[in-house]
Amino acid sequence: MKLEPLFDLDPNVTVRTRFAPSPTGYLHVGGARTALYSWLFAKHHHGEFVLRIEDTDLERSTPEATAAIIEGMEWLNLAWEHGPYFQTKRFTRYNQVIDQMIEQGLAYRCYCTKERLEELRHSQEANKEKPRYDRHCLHDHSHSPDEPHVVRFKNPQEGSVIFDDAVRGRIEISNSELDDLIIRRTDGSPTYNFCVVVDDWDMGITHVVRGEDHINNTPRQINILNALGAPIPTYAHVSMINGDDGQKLSKRHGAVSVMQYRDDGYLPEALVNYLVRLGWGHGDQEIFSREEMINLFELEHVSKSASAFNTEKLQWLNQHYMRELPADYVANHLAWQYRDLGIDTANGPALTDIVSMLAERSKTLREMALSSRYFFEEFETFDETAAKKHLKAAAVQPLEKVKEKLTALSVWDAHSTHEAIEQTAADLDVGMGKVGMPLRVAVTGAGQSPSMDVTLAAIGRERVLARIDKAIAFIKAKAA
């Protein structure tokens, strides 16, 4: 029954998948994993990936949510060959198909009032029958098409819908369980389940990867596709993601928005690697490059069971990628964190140096940015615990002595500053810690930092000397 095709599809493409979010909120991690699985399956089979925005819920859909979804997909580097397509721009197409279905007896107008449908439902419930439409209007020709009505799909009454789910195996639903679905509302707008069918048909979708919450929609959609004479895609319904307490993942478990993970300082490679393993695996392997994911991914290896989100595992992966990815790439993502925090990095070390110094010490880029402010801007106060422990009267002499050594350096680098600290300790006949720890608190404001030689070299001579003076003044003011 296909009308003129609206898309110029490459006949040589044998696999075409889609990700079809509703723009009623952000891109959450469950949706991101679905998109990733769909994308990987297409890439594995040298196919195409379509992005479709299912925005038929006019009251809840927003341009901001659409922008957030696209931003999330781009951040995860899940590029699409086609789209984004918007269902609200295809209403003419949907109604063309509905009108032709009415002409061919595949669908019919229903003029039943809300009151009649309520009475029918109460009657069926009283008789312990499953509530369903009784086809009162199927052969009723007493109404004018101009009267308010919905359009219902004429669902088969006999037999079953059987499909082989790529994740869950064979699923069978009796047609007696299915109603005559409304496919066009009284206001003339097509309904979600119908739009999805026409889109998958028009866009040549061969494999539909989506959440298990869509399983009940599948038999209805298959029946409509069969009525249209359209090919049936392979369906794959992936399990839900739970929190580590076994409950459905929600905000109380922490971040659920993809872009919140960006904001919290995770690299996209870490989140993608984590999500791919959240329901799929290849032996005991934990770390996967993008190329390995594409080469190894198959829907048959996706678990039917719900997965538990573990933030500690994600942090472990994030640390791995912060260490292993090129420093300039990590630095580009780190730069976003500094901008978001309002930290001006113009006067300070190269961000690649920050990555080299702090990648081993930080779980996230956010933590890295927050713990490295002292490289770029002055601090007002010292960490209270660190100052109480190390900025005491006994620290004045080591600080004054090391300042003399540092001031006299002809070359300011990690090697020279290390020698200055070492020589100060030797001159005072004390351990390195008696010099290094007060110096660390003096120049960073905190009790923890990378090794002092690289820290001093990165902060710069002028700032270091001024901060030592500030620490000495702080100690003397306390003692006064």
From Swiss-Prot:
Its EC number is 6.1.1.17. Binds 1 zinc ion per subunit. ATP binds at residue 251. Zn(2+) binds at residues 110, 112, 137, 139. A motif ('KMSKS' region) lies at residues 248-252. Its cofactor is Zn(2+). It comes from the Bacteria. GO terms for biological process: glutamyl-tRNA aminoacylation. It is an enzyme of class 6 (ligase). InterPro entries: aa-tRNA-synth_I_cd-bd, aa-tRNA-synth_I_codon-bd_sub2, aa-tRNA-synth_I_CS, aa_tRNA-synth_I_cd-bd_sf, Glu-tRNA-ligase_bac/mito, Glu/Gln-tRNA-synth, Glu/Gln-tRNA-synth_Ib_cat-dom, GluQ/Sye. A motif ('HIGH' region) lies at residues 21-31. Its main location: cytoplasm. GO terms for cellular component: cytosol. Keywords: Aminoacyl-tRNA synthetase, ATP-binding, Cytoplasm, Ligase, Metal-binding, Nucleotide-binding, Protein biosynthesis, Zinc. One of its GO terms (molecular function) is glutamate-tRNA ligase activity. PROSITE patterns: AA_TRNA_LIGASE_I (PS00178). PANTHER family: GLUTAMATE--TRNA LIGASE, GLUTAMATE--TRNA LIGASE, MITOCHONDRIAL-RELATED. Belongs to the class-I aminoacyl-tRNA synthetase family. Glutamate--tRNA ligase type 1 subfamily. Catalyzes the attachment of glutamate to tRNA(Glu) in a two-step reaction: glutamate is first activated by ATP to form Glu-AMP and then transferred to the acceptor end of tRNA(Glu). This is Glutamate--tRNA ligase. The lineage of its organism: Bacteria, Pseudomonadati, Pseudomonadota, Gammaproteobacteria, Pasteurellales.
